[in-house]
């Protein structure tokens, strides 16, 4: 039998007018897996829809980043359900921390991504104490670029992340 892990970590809960940004929990799996199985949602997140098991593993990785780095992605809750994610992540191959966000398709076009990403952005600047965050956005992802612009980000460069060309948007404090 393996020993118990002694690491503990806290994930704060953030509130906006319409949203709660909080830790992912097991009860989010049905909504999260449906979102990750949607080809339109996954189009700009690697392109391949995820199975239920892959969605569970993604939730585990999201929680693992909180344990390893002390920050990560929040579940975005609206109308009593998990509608997506927003937060700050920093994968090993990323050149700097990224403000990232993604919502399930029924929640598109309602300003929810901007609201969630704005709350995560403010929290990220405070938590990390940094002067900038990146958003790596595929060139065809017009909706995500619009969110970045609304939050005051500026497209500064292009790079390749996990084999995909992306525009490098920069958010400054």
Map each language-model feature to its residues.
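Active-site rim helix/loop that mediates acceptor-substrate recognition in acyltransferases
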Residues: 51-70
